[in-house]
Amino acid sequence: MPSSPHPFLDHPSPIPFAHRGGASDWPENTLPAFEAAVRLGYRYLETDVQATADGVLLAFHDDDLRRTCGVAGRISELPWSKVSEARVHGREPIPLFADLVEAFPDARLNIDCKTDAALEPLAAALKRDHLLDRVCIGSFSHRRITRLRRMFGSELCTAMSPSEVARWVSGVMPKGAHVAQVPVRQGPMPVVTGRSVERAHRHGIPVHVWTIDDAAEMHRLLDLGVDGLMTDRPEVLRDVLVERGTWR
């Protein structure tokens, strides 16, 4: 497979990602979760971004606070002064995206832009903090990905949108994305197969798979030739890669 020209992807394959910092072991998307992953040796941290009603960018997955914080309220409808009072699992504050950038200056950040409201604050942060070499952006919205590509061009590493993934799996390689970041299956449709991985590699596109927590499945996917795995169980993935001699 040709090497990617983007600096975000210059780590030897396979790349291990701590998904939300390691959501099975720590309160997800919190500084302690990311700190634990970095202590294990992770250089790639996966996170999500949401924006408050007053445009403050947060590292947080849901718009609704109930699942992780146990309180009513939507981030997009509340000012940061209110959202900042919430605690993940009752104890950890929701971090600002800027906190994550500052706390882990050597980490690469894989970012899922969750909403349209988060797009402009995210773009501003990428410019302000000169982050283009150390981030990759994905989204379930093709429109959001397209807007970011128009803003930054190929200097911004972007993952395939769902519609681009569908084209890739059907045999037509889309243009514009630097990487495929995908589940093993999308509903009934297999996504990660030997054939799809080979097709991506033929076009110079690495394949990262989420979210894989079982050691046997990690081995199976690595045997297929995937280039990265995202996991909620960072210790398990580290041990698998150590066993294979590919923990770097």
Regions found by a protein language model. Give the residues of each.
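Phosphate-group recognition and catalysis centered on beta-loop-alpha active-site segments
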Residues: 1-248
